Amino acid sequence: MYDTGQEAPRCILVGRKTGREETSSLPELSLLVEELGYIPETILSFPLRTPERKFLFGPGQAEVVAREARMRGIELVVFDEDLTPAQQRNWEHLVKSRVMDRTEVIIEIFSRHARTKQAQLQTEKARLEYLLPRLRGAWSHLDRQRGGARGTRGEGERQIELDRRMILSRLARIRREMEAIERHQTTTRSRRLEAGIPRVSLVGYTNAGKSSLFTRLTGQAVRIQDRPFVTLDTTTRTCLIPGWGRVVVSDTVGFIQHLPHTLVDAFHATLEEVRDAHLLLEVVDLSSPNLLLHLSTTEEVLTEIGAHHIPRIRVYNKADRSSPHPLLPPSDHPEILVSAKTGEGIEGLLSLIVREMERHYPIETLELPYHRLGESHEVLSRAVIIHQEYTDVGLFVRYAPSVPSVHE
């Protein structure tokens, strides 16, 4: 949250009572609304066995929220659940203040952090698709003011139709621009595939320290802040892994619990970098009290985007913040504790990357006398050279044959 010198507006958070604090996403929602500049003054949670059509929650629970909002003079009510357009309108009429659901909060944060043309297009697409079914509530006050005779179209209805056409037209232009960017990215990825260079993608929950680890591995500084969703664009760099050779490392957008499907769809091109990886570094915030929830959410998102089968190393980051270290859950993947901030464990991580690459993409050797050096080009033109040495008798090379795509 930014300090503007003015008192931040206050809000109420409303969510589902889970019975287990570690599975509740309300604390995370509190951090998200703070990122938008609001102060969560009250958090209300209710059991939700059967969703109600009008308010999602029951009428008695709705009255509790409305009474709390009136008593405290609240400017915003935020729901940790997705609301239908009708439910959102009903709540706004009841509490007489702005109402947002979790999806809208996340889309708004994405919009504020989008820096590149692609990220701006992706977030605008998600925002417009979210807004489209909610146009009715935006102009209904015009029809109420004018009354409107039966069988005639009111001013509000005409405005809705005009807005709908404008949004659909804008969405069509956005899709065309995104397709042009994606074609260029596909060409770039194809060239890397042809070069046979292995690709390593950093994935994990938002604010786990992926960008800090990316900087530590590649030596290339990227935008790093202790805030959610600072990274929305995929940043890719080639780096040299001792004992292996060149790899392409990618820093990707962070995951979050209940990641809106509109954003998964809008960012599908960005997430292609994850699906095309040969090895994933699953970065986990070791100091987070919600570590287990972050692990399960990451697994869900990787499954949703079709990347759960890719070889993976679980990297518990921020080891410098966690003492003593918590008891870690069992894992099917190799794991290591590191601190991207201090460098602790990074050498061990590099060794683990080499071990996993060799396990999945075996190393071969080539020995050629000097009079046959011309034959090396055919073998090594698409290989990953790990070690090359000219000896007294000829050329000695350790290499990985052209690393196949994970989809091959």
UniProtKB/Swiss-Prot annotation:
Keywords, comma-separated and alphabetical: Cytoplasm, GTP-binding, Magnesium, Metal-binding, Nucleotide-binding
Superkingdom: Bacteria
Compartment(s): Cytoplasm
InterPro entries, sorted: G_HFLX_dom (IPR030394), GTP-bd (IPR006073), GTP-bd_M (IPR032305), GTPase_HflX (IPR016496), GTPase_HflX_N (IPR025121), GTPase_HflX_N_sf (IPR042108), P-loop_NTPase (IPR027417)
Positions of Mg(2+) binding: S211, T231
Cofactors demanded by this protein: Mg(2+)
GO molecular function: GTP binding; GTPase activity; metal ion binding; ribosome binding
Start and end residues of each Hflx-type G domain: 198-361
Family: Belongs to the TRAFAC class OBG-HflX-like GTPase superfamily. HflX GTPase family.
Subunit structure: Monomer. Associates with the 50S ribosomal subunit.
General function of this protein: GTPase that associates with the 50S ribosomal subunit and may have a role during protein synthesis or ribosome biogenesis.
Protein name per Swiss-Prot or TrEMBL: GTPase HflX
Organism of origin: Spirochaeta thermophila (strain ATCC 49972 / DSM 6192 / RI 19.B1)
Lineage, top ranks: Bacteria, Pseudomonadati, Spirochaetota, Spirochaetia, Spirochaetales
